[in-house]
Amino acid sequence: TIDAIASAYLWLMLESGMSVWFCGETASGKTTLLRATCVFIRPEAKIISIEDTPEIIVPHDNWVREVTRQGEDTESSIELFDLLKASLRQRPNYIIVGEIRGKEAYVAFQAMQVGAPVITTFHAGSVQKLIQRLTGAPIDIPKSYIDILNCAVIQSAVRLPSTGTLERRVLSINEIVGYDSVEDRFDFIELFSWDPVSDTFIFRGEGSSHLLENKIAIMRGIPRRRVREIYKELENRAIFLEKLVEKGVLDYFDVWKAVKVAWKVGVEEALKMVLRGEEIWKY
């Protein structure tokens, strides 16, 4: 579905409090990937998940699961919109929504605006369709607010040319840069893209990421003259994840334990521990 460097990028995004939306058509694997990436959220974070059907498992200690309820009438029903509004009063560090479909998107943007990252799935097959749905009726997000959403992951079920089998792949990972009111256009950077011929992921490379250089590097205290360090951090995280796969560490909770060690001692030190043969996923 996704390779190590793209996974490492999502790790940096989620750990740093960026809002990431997993988008695609029906049965494209959106919820599965969202659920898998929850291990990248900071271990001490307070997380609220909101769903119609409880599917998402969050391994964190400070996790509150909220589920909608269908009553006999509108007064006894509890909708996503209601839970999302109520969640803001609980001051979460992260809000996870199973799927955003309608008016609750407006509340999600309010949450992101006040500093609560929202991680969710959304039915859209491209960045253009995502923006079109968000800015059109009935959601009607103002165009100038769109860059409050940091990152859009576009997924699809695809038939591989080499085998003819149906697989799920991330088609692209995109950074939302902003809205140009003069040109009336939205600017975004396709940082990762999937090549169907080779079934590999293409990363645009150093110097191409708006979020890494202008948000996350600053948050981590990296000055502009040393901005290459954020790409080195990305590379270290990718190698760390590759080593876990090489050692057969595929269980969700084992990966979570390994990521927690990396959070505690630093990714570079955790990588050294793995290379020395330490089984940090058993800690």
Regions found by a protein language model. Name each.
Residues 135-138, 153, 181, 220, ...:
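Generic secondary-structure transition motif, activating predominantly at the C-termini of alpha-helices
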Residues 232-283:
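Terminal-proximal interaction/regulatory segments of ATP-powered molecular machines
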Residues 3, 7-26, 32-158:
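Switch/coupling sub-region of P-loop NTPases
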Residues 121, 136, 228-231, 246-249:
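Generic amphipathic alpha-helical segments used as scaffolds and interaction surfaces in large
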Residues 151-241:
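Conserved P-loop NTPase
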Residues 43-52, 71-75, 118-125, 149, ...:
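Short, Lys/Arg-enriched charge-dense amphipathic segments
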